Amino acid sequence: MSKIIGIDLGTTNSCVAVMDGGQVKIIENAEGARTTPSIVAYMEDGEILVGAPAKRQAVTNPKNTLYAVKRLIGRKFDEKAVQKDIHLMPYTITKADNGDAWVEVRGSKLAPPQVSAEVLRKMKKTAEDYLGEPVTEAVITVPAYFNDSQRQATKDAGRIAGLEVKRIINEPTAAALAFGLDKTEKGDRKIAVYDLGGGTFDVSIIEIADVDGEKQFEVLSTNGDTFLGGEDFDQRIIDYIIGEFKKEQGVDLSKDVLALQRLKEAAEKAKIELSSSQQTEINLPYITADASGPKHLNLKITRAKLESLVEELIERTIEPCRVAIKDAGVKVSDIDDVILVGGMTRMPKVQEKVKEFFGREPRKDVNPDEAVAAGAAIQGSVLSGDRKDVLLLDVTPLSLGIETLGGVMTKMIQKNTTIPTRFSQTFSTADDNQPAVTIKVFQGEREIAAGNKALGEFNLEGIPPAPRGLPQIEVTFDIDANGILHVSAKDKGTGKENKITIKANSGLSEDEIQRMVKDAEANAEEDHRLAELALARNQADALVHATRKSLTEYGDKLEAAEKESIEKALKDVEESLKAGDKAEIDAKVEALTQASQKLGEKMYADAQAQQAAQQASHQQAADNAKPVDDNVVDADFKEVKRDN
C-alpha cells in the first residue's frame, strides 16, 4: 500500500513529509531545499514554474507570478480582507461568476484552488521522487481558524492535484502531534501552539494525555486571524521604504509594478536579517527613473525601526491567545509548554511578546517551518494503520447555525466542539400553509445571522398545508473529521428529506473540479513533453558541437560533396532547434548522424593510422634501446689491499 504523505500548504512556503521506518522524514525538493516557496509563475510559452524557479523570475514577470494565493482560497471577492489585498498585489484579483475571489493571468481566470494545486503537485512529485513510487493520498493542513469554505477549497485543490485528501488537519494540531510524540514525559500536559505564518495566525490550547500507553491529543480551544501573517509584516516595510523614497526623491514607487516586486523581495530579506542582526541595509540600484535619469535606493533599517512598524500587528495576536485560554477553561499558569510555529515566530519581538503573555520561555526545540508537515505525516501514518498509539481529537473553530425568524443566528454547534459531531434540532414554519422552508447555514459568533459567514442554503419543499408552528422540520448538522459540514432537513410528518454538503454558496462545482483535474493532467503531459523536448535539444546541441569540431579537424580529408552534405545537415538541425518541434529535431539529428558517417569513417581510419604509427615508433625505440654487442663476457676481478 502506498504511503499517505503529509503536506503543509503554506501561504509563503510549503513542506512535505512522510513516515519512513517509524521516523518522520522531511523531504527535500528537486532544488535541494526542505521547504518550497508557494509561488506559481505562468510563462509566455505555457510553461508553469513552481517554487524557487518561479520566485527567481518574479521581478521580471510580476503580473503572472502568483504568491500568497492561500489568502484568497475559499473567499468572496467583496470581503473586506480581499479588497485590502487587491491594491497590494502586482497580479490581478478578479470577481468570478459565483462571487468568489479568483486571479487572472495571461488572459485566463483561475480559481485559487487551481493555483494551490500546482504547489501540491510539486509536493506530490517531491514525495514520489523520494519514495520511488506513485503517491495518491495525502493529509493536508489548514489554519485552525479556516472556515468551512476555505477547508472545502483546500480539499478541492488536493483533488485537482491528483491527490485523495484523506484528512484536512489543523496546523497547530499537527505541530502539537510532531512535538508530543517526540517527548518522553509521562502524565498530562497542556500546551499552547502559537502559529504565526506567512498569511495566517492561529493559537490552539491542546491537552496531551497518556491513556493506557496511547497518546491522546485533545484540542481544548482554538482562535486566530486568517488574514494576519508575514505578508502583512513585509507590507509594513514596503510602505515605509516607499514613504522614505518619496520624501527623498519625490518619486512614488507604489505605481511601479516592477519596482514593487523588487521591494517585496528586499523587504522579506531585511525582515529575516533583522531577526539576527540589529541593522540591515536595503540597496536597490536603478529602482526607477525619471526625466533626470536613473534613481537608486539606499536605506538603512534598524531592528528597533522594524519593531515600531509592526508593533500593532504583533499586538493583534495577543487577543486571540486570551480568548483561546478563556474558551479552554484554563489559566495561563496551567500551560506547561508554549510551541512556536511559522517562520514569523523567529522574530525576537514576537518571541518576547509570547513570553510576556504566557509567562514562560517558548520551546526552542521545534522547527517552526517543518513541524506542521511532520504532524501531517504522523496523522497520515495513523490513518493508514501504521501507527495505533495516537488519538487525535480536534475541534470546530467557529459556531455553526441557521438563520431563524427575525434574522437571528440559532447556533446548532458551538465553537470548540470536538469533531466529528452531530446535532439535530426541530424547527417549524413561520407562516400558515407555508409550502417550503429555506435553510440558510451560517458560521460565526455574531447573534445576527447577517453578521456571520454565509456557508450555503437549500430548500425543503412539499410541506403539506398547515397552520404556522405545526409542521415539524428536523434540521441536522453533521461535521466530519475534516471539519466539513453536512446539513439535512427532514419533514417529520411526510418523511421528506433534503441534504447538502456545504460547498458554500460559492466554491467550485463538481464539473469545475473535474475540468481542472483534466487541465492538471494535461499540464502533466505538457510538462513531460517539455522535458522530452529539452532532452532532445540537449542531445542535438551536443551532436552539432561535436560534428563541427570534427569537421574542422578532418573536413579536408572529405570529398567536397560529403562536406557539403554534412554542413547542410548541421544547418537543418540548427533550424529545427529554433522551431522547437521534437519530432523534427529527432528527424534532423538522424539525418545529421547519417550524413556524418563518412566523417566518422575518416576519423576512425585516421585514429587507426595514428595508432599503427605509434606502435611502430614504440617498437623502433625498443629496438634502439637494446645493447649493440650481445657477446659480452663477465670479467673476474680481484680486490687488492694496499699497505698504507
Swiss-Prot record:
It comes from Bordetella avium (strain 197N). This is Chaperone protein DnaK. Belongs to the heat shock protein 70 family. Residues 609-625 have a biased composition (Low complexity). The modification Phosphothreonine is found at T200. Residues 609-644 are annotated as: Disordered. Induction: By stress conditions e.g. heat shock. NCBIfam families: PRK00290.1, PRK05183.1, prok_dnaK. HAMAP family: DnaK. The keyword Chaperone applies. Pfam families: HSP70. One of its GO terms (molecular function) is ATP-dependent protein folding chaperone. PANTHER family: HEAT SHOCK PROTEIN 70KDA. The lineage of its organism: Bacteria, Pseudomonadati, Pseudomonadota, Betaproteobacteria, Burkholderiales. CDD domains: ASKHA_NBD_HSP70_DnaK-like. Acts as a chaperone. Residues 635-644 have a biased composition (Basic and acidic residues). Keywords: ATP-binding, Chaperone, Nucleotide-binding, Phosphoprotein, Stress response.
